[in-house]
UniProtKB/Swiss-Prot annotation:
It comes from Gluconobacter oxydans (strain 621H) (Gluconobacter suboxydans). This is Gluconokinase. Belongs to the gluconokinase GntK/GntV family. GO terms for biological process: D-gluconate metabolic process. Monomer.
Length: 178
């Protein structure tokens, strides 16, 4: 356990902060990692260069495009579980099959699904700078999204709230479960 986990009375968790582009995955995930002393991985950084190029030219990814990326995300999660310390990964995890691939080998992964209105997402993506994914791909991501079912290990949070509020809600949730 990290010092932060011990101070807060939390056991290590292995989280995938998920949702379409613009939900605030990175903000929430880095906030959790910082507050709790967990390891963090930006899932976008694991994309093969061909995927980044494809998205940056406005082309949506296919399942075949995503497969090697999801494998790298899974491998990172598996290493974190093996090490036994808390970890947070950002990953859109749009389809149930993607989430199942991330949880392969029976990894104890939990998903934090950030749900944000289409209007808010569009506004955020129009204002966002320095990211390879253009706002024009939002409709494709929304069409691909399979909202996690009640039978999946998911915590739902609102992306409409301030990130600090979301962080506090998540930490309270973890404390209540531990």
């Amino acid at each position: 356990m990290t010092e932060h986990e011990t101070q807060m009375g939390l056991k290590p968790r292995f989280l995938v902060v998920m949702g379409v582009s613009g939900t605030g995955k990175t903000t929430v995930a880095t906030g959790l990692a910082t507050r709790l002393g967990w390891h963090f991985q930006e899932g976008d950084a694991l994309h093969p260069p061909a995927n980044v190029e494809k998205m940056s030219t406005g082309q949506p990814l296919t399942d075949a495009d995503r497969a090697p990326w999801l494998a790298l995300c899974h491998d990172w999660l598996r290493e974190q579980v093996k090490a036994g310390h808390g970890a947070v990964l950002t990953c859109s995890a749009l389809k149930r099959s993607y989430r199942e691939q991330l949880r392969g080998d029976d990894l104890p992964i939990e998903f934090v699904h950030i749900d944000t209105s289409t209007g808010e997402l569009a506004d955020r993506l129009q204002r966002r700078e320095g990211h390879f994914m253009p706002a024009s791909l939002l409709p494709s991501q929304l069409a691909t999204l399979e909202v996690p079912g009640d039978d999946e290990p998911v915590i739902r949070v609102s992306g409409e709230k301030h990130p600090d509020v979301v962080l506090e809600e998540l930490i309270r949730h973890f404390q209540a479960e531990d």
